[in-house]
From Swiss-Prot:
SMART domains: PKS_ER. Zn(2+) 2 binds at residues 93, 96, 99, 107. It is an enzyme of class 1 (oxidoreductase). Its main location: cytoplasm. The record marks 148 as: Important for catalytic activity for the proton relay mechanism but does not participate directly in the coordination of zinc atom. Belongs to the zinc-containing alcohol dehydrogenase family. This is L-threonine 3-dehydrogenase. Pathway: Amino-acid degradation; L-threonine degradation via oxydo-reductase pathway; glycine from L-threonine: step 1/2. The keyword Mitochondrion does not apply. NAD(+) binds at residues 175, 195, 200, 262-264, 286-287.
């Protein structure tokens, strides 16, 4: 099979031939149709400090994918050959306190598909049965391939009630855009998104936000005034990882406001804890997806008409992976998809 491999501890990836995988007793083999390029994949490609201390080589990378089950292990009980599936990229231990309590997204022993174990940027991928979501209704393969980051967006957007609320989203990358789609679809009153990239802000306008703000030019307080708001945002979603974004978010929250924080800062930073206390704010960290409640929510949202198509802006055959990665890294895009069905 063809696979995109980090062959050595150095920058770059190689599209190479590997033996087709075989399933263990509890595993399934998926013929991969589409994959999505994630920021994690860009880190592994460039071989930055994080990748060098985290990722073993050689390794098939990639964790966002969709495809068809083509083989199952002897102990598999639910997935069947022919099922169309997406993959959950977090591999959990199944034996810790949280796993045994059904809180698998809180497993302290989580490992990453395409980070610690061979991933899905290949014509075939193998993973545990418990890590696949079977699509019972039709889902576009491109959309099915990004259920992993879509799940991050849904987990973030729905962790607090948004019906009738004024919502602020800091960061208009693919996850921020999908979070905006979800918040709007779920009944938020105003949805405001911020970024410093006009290209991404234009994508946000296409998905239907009420206001897209370039914070290099305009403050969030000015956005409040433009929408006729006077008491601050009820719910915020920080997905940029920028310290300044969280600081300005706190300044613009309503008393009793709630902040879902998915963005990962590159280093420690200070915030105004006095404002958090005096405003009685709730700040909640978000990591991955709730397995598999978030996946159920994703499917229901799509079945009820949520449209993610504007978020997917570029598609490449896997043979043009270098161009695809360059496009994703440049940032003038939404989600970038690799097609593994073309030779």
């Amino acid at each position: 099979m063809r696979a995109l491999v980090k062959t050595s501890p150095a920058p770059g990836l190689e599209l190479t031939e590997l033996p087709d995988p075989t399933p263990g007793a509890n595993d399934i083999v998926v013929q991969v149709f589409r994959t999505g390029i994630c920021g994690t994949d860009l880190h592994i490609d460039s071989w930055d400090e994080w990748a060098a201390r985290t990722v073993p080589t050689p390794l098939v990378i990639g964790h966002e994918f969709a495809g068809e089950v083509v083989a199952v292990g002897s102990a598999v009980t639910q997935a069947q050959v022919g099922d169309f599936v997406s993959g959950e990229g977090h591999l959990v231990c199944g034996t810790c306190r949280n796993c045994r309590a059904g809180r698998r997204h809180l497993c302290a022993n989580t490992r990453g598909l395409g980070v610690h174990h061979n991933g899905a940027f290949a014509e075939y991928a193998v993973l545990p049965e418990q890590n696949v979501w079977v699509h019972r209704e039709h889902v576009d393969p491109d959309v099915a391939a990004i259920f992993d980051p879509f799940g991050n967006a849904v987990h973030t957007a729905l962790t607090f009630p948004v019906v009738g609320e004024d919502v602020l989203i800091t960061g208009a990358g693919p996850i921020g855009l999908m979070a905006a789609c979800v918040a709007r679809h779920a009944g938020a009153r105003n949805v405001v998104i911020t970024d410093v990239s006009e290209h991404r802000l234009e994508l946000a306008r296409r998905v239907g936000v009420d206001l897209a703000v370039n914070v290099a030019e305009t403050g969030i307080a000015d956005a409040q005034a433009k929408l006729g708001m006077s008491e601050g945002f009820d719910v915020a979603m920080e997905v940029s990882g920028q310290p300044s974004a969280l600081r300005e978010t706190i300044e613009n929250m309503a008393h009793g406001g709630r902040i879902a924080m998915l963005g990962l800062p590159a280093e420690r930073f200070q915030i105004d804890w006095s404002a958090v206390v005096l405003k009685m704010l709730t700040v909640k960290g978000i990591y991955g997806r709730e397995m598999f409640e978030t996946w159920y929510s994703m499917s229901v949202l799509l079945q009820s008409g949520l449209d993610l198509s504007p978020v997917i802006t570029h598609r490449f055959p896997c043979t043009r992976h270098v161009e695809a990665f360059e496009t994703a890294r440049a940032g003038r895009c939404g989600k970038v998809i690799l097609d593994w069905t073309v030779r």
